[in-house]
Structures are given as structure tokens and as C-alpha cells.
């Protein structure tokens, strides 16, 4: 139903593949019926393979997997086999547990996978964080040579483990991601991902005991204890309405923003909606990117 309701969509990326273990065995929930339905709707299917959320899930495990050529080969062969069997059009690599030590092995995996993809007519795309000094090991420049598309995850600027509340995807964060990526990757190969979700932040002052426990850590610099939950666009709007709060434009982030208090807790939310997304789409057009991606289908409001 989500596919039928979505306009302007060309490609769907279901999270069908996980790395089962460090030997490179594959876990798959790929569906031929789904692929056939998507093809009838005029959509390509690029199935995602992940190194988290099922199967392996740590930097150490990804290193154990990728640092052996036999394990890489095992994973690639199983992956290509599953893709061909179900009639999938592309593979999307979403590996987010790559340490500095693992970088050279990771890029070798992408290199080897790209050869097999070309031989079998499979589109290869690779997901990437917004470029920062601490994630250079992903080697976007080499990815840009070997992959068909390099996808920027232009969100999680503030995420579930953040020590302070903030926007999931501010305008400047997205701008930086695009500008830094196209320094290394041809723009016609770059797709920028935007969020169809936001976070509702809950803040309470830390107790003296909590502050004492955090002494000497980065967390000690933040006097508020912060938790958050991810919400789709419509649910986020509903939360604001239920609280009787007003939204105002936060010109720093480009998001509509709301805050309110209840039972000693301060709530904050930076909305993702047409107001925040339109300028980001304009950035993508100006930089002549290959396209736009979003996480995740079904979280958007009807106007999007």
C-alpha cells in the first residue's frame, strides 16, 4: 500500500539482508512477490545489506568478517546468488560498524563486490555518513570510482545517543554533507538521504549524584539528562497539538521548532516537514546530484 500511495518514487530499498556471522554467511528475508509487485509498479528494488540490527553488530565483528578474503568472497557469492534468485535490481551496502583499522578491508570488499555486480548487471550503491574527520576510513573517493551511487545519510545529526537535544537534520548539516562528498565523488553519482522522521526530546536536570558519576567524562559538560524517541512526521505534529504547544521557525536549523513543559520535564522537537525539506531539495538541484533518498517510507506526511 505504501508503494501504491507514493508519488515520484523510482526505487525502493528494503532491509532484506544481514550478515549472519563473521564467516560471511548471509541472512535473507528477500521476497520474490515483493519484487514482482514493485516491478509492476515501475519501481526498481535495491536490497540493503547491513552489519547491524541482526546478525553481526559490532566494529570488531565487521573487522573479523572483512579482513579475510575468504569471508568476503563467501558473503559476496551468497549475496549475488540471493539477488539473482529473487530478481532484485541492486544492492545497497549499509555498513555502519567500520573502524579505522577496518577501512582498508572495507574498501576491498566494496571493490570485490563491485566487480561481481558489474558482471551480473546489478546496481551497487553504498551508504555513508556526512563526512567528518572521524569517518574518513570509509574512503568515499574510492567508493565513487567503484560504486554506481554513493548515498549520504543526511540525518542523525542528533541521534538516540546524543548528549544534547537538537535537529535530526539541519540545513547546514545537509549542506556540509553534500559539499564535502562532491569534493571526492562525482555529483552525478551522489544521492542525498533526508529523514522522514524527527525526535521528541525529553530533558530533566541531572541530580548531583549523576553529575558526580559523570565527572571527567564528556557527559559532565551537559547539565541536562536527555532522552529521545524517533517519530514519524504526522505523529510528531500530533504530539505538539496534544501538548497545546506552538511551532516557530528555528532559523539556525531551518526546522519548525516547539517546546513545552509537563511534570518537571522539558520537551523539545525540531520538525521535519515541507518547510525543512524543500530547501534541502533545492540544495540537491543546485549541486546537480543524482537524486534524493529518504528514511523511511511510511513515516512521511501526505503533503510530502
Segments (PLM) and residue ranges:
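Hydrophobic faces of well-ordered beta-strands that scaffold small-molecule active sites
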Residues: 10-14, 45-49, 91-93, 124-126, ...
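Aromatic-rich peripheral "rim/lid" segments of glycoside hydrolase catalytic domains that contact
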Residues: 283-286, 297-304
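A structural motif corresponding to the C-terminal end of an alpha-helix
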Residues: 37-45, 82-88, 116-121, 146, ...
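Substrate-binding surface in catalytic domains of secreted glycosidases
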Residues: 21-26, 77, 100-235
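Catalytic domains of carbohydrate-active enzymes, especially glycoside hydrolases
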Residues: 2-22, 78-91, 279-292
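Glycan-recognition patch characteristic of GH18 chitinases/ENGases
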Residues: 1-78
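Structural recognition of alpha->loop->beta junctions
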Residues: 5-11, 67-91, 138-158
Amino acid at each position: 500500500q505504501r508503494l501504491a500511495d507514493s508519488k515520484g518514487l523510482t526505487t525502493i530499498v528494503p532491509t532484506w539482508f544481514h550478515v549472519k556471522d563473521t564467516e560471511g554467511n548471509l541472512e535473507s528475508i528477500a521476497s520474490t512477490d515483493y519484487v514482482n509487485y514493485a516491478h509492476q509498479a515501475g519501481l526498481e528494488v535495491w536490497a540493503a545489506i547491513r552489519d547491524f540490527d541482526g546478525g553481526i553488530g559490532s566494529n570488531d565483528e565487521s573487522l573479523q568478517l572483512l579482513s579475510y578474503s575468504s569471508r568476503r568472497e563467501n558473503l559476496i557469492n551468497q549475496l549475488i546468488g540471493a539477488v539473482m534468485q529473487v530478481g532484485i535490481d541492486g544492492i545497497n551496502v549499509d555498513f555502519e560498524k567500520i573502524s579505522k583499522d577496518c577501512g582498508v578491508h572495507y574498501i576491498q570488499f566494496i571493490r570485490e563486490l563491485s566487480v561481481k555486480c558489474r558482471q551480473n548487471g546489478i546496481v551497487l550503491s553504498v551508504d555513508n555518513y556526512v563526512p567528518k574527520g572521524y569517518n574518513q576510513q570509509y574512503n568515499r573517493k574510492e567508493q565513487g570510482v567503484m560504486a554506481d551511487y554513493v548515498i549520504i545519510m543526511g540525518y542523525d545529526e542528533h541521534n538516540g545517543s546524543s548528549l544534547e537535544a537538537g535537529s535530526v537534520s539541519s540545513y547546514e548539516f545537509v549542506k556540509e554533507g553534500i559539499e564535502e562528498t562532491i569534493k571526492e565523488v562525482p555529483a552525478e553519482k551522489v544521492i542525498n538521504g533526508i529523514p522522514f522522521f524527527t525526535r521528541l526530546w525529553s530533558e530533566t536536570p541531572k541530580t548531583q549524584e549523576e553529575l558526580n558519576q559523570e565527572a571527567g567524562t564528556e557527559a559532565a559538560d551537559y547539565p541536562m539528562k536527555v532522552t529521545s524517541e524517533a517519530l514519524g512526521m504526522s505523529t510528531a505534529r500530533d504530539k505538539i497539538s496534544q501538548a497545546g504547544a506552538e511551532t516557530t521557525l528555528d532559523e539556525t536549523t531551518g526546522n519548525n521548532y516547539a517546546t513545552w513543559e509537563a511534570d518537571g520535564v522539558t520537551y523539545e522537537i525540531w520538525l521535519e516537514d515541507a518547510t525543512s525539506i524543500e530547501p534541502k531539495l533545492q540544495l540537491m538541484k543546485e549541486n546537480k546530484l543524482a537524486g534524493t533518498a529518504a528514511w523511511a517510507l511510511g513515516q512521511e506526511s501526505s503533503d510530502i
